[in-house]
């Protein structure tokens, strides 16, 4: 399997984990030194991401659809860029919402495994 294919497989696994509410599977996508920057929010670590996503999974039925525009690999570093659509439905009733976001992720390969080390996203207008 090429590095490009391995990264695409990791992205597909991320979406499967997110869509099934599998927090452990979702967190496996990220490097332990993760720094995540989201629009309008402070940067967060992997532990902070875990707390936030745990709360989201508890409160909402979730779905993510990812469209990769670009995957580029250079040695043990890579980046991906694309668009994802998150759909959330409150578990206690309420209106389903969709949010379209553009993302950029920086990947690091360690011990043969690709993980996201840095990620940022913003709302598409």
Descriptions of predicted regions:
Residues 4-10, 20-74, 83, 95-99:
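A solvent-exposed, acidic/Ser-Thr-rich amphipathic alpha-helical stretch
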Residues 12-15:
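Amphipathic alpha-helical repeat scaffolds
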Residues 71-78, 107-113:
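A short, structured loop/turn motif at beta-sheet edges
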């Amino acid at each position: 399997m090429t590095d490009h294919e391995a990264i695409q497989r990791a992205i597909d696994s991320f979406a499967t984990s997110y869509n099934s509410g599998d927090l452990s599977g979702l967190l496996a996508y990220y490097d332990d030194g993760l720094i995540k920057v989201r629009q309008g929010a402070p940067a967060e670590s992997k532990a902070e991401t875990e707390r936030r996503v745990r709360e989201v999974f508890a409160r909402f039925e979730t779905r993510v659809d990812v469209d990769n525009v670009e995957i580029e690999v250079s040695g043990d570093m890579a980046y991906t860029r694309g668009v994802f659509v998150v759909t959330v439905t409150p578990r206690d009733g309420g209106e389903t919402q969709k949010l379209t976001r553009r993302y950029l992720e920086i990947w690091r390969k360690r011990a043969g495994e690709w993980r996201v080390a840095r990620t940022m996203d913003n709302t598409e207008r």
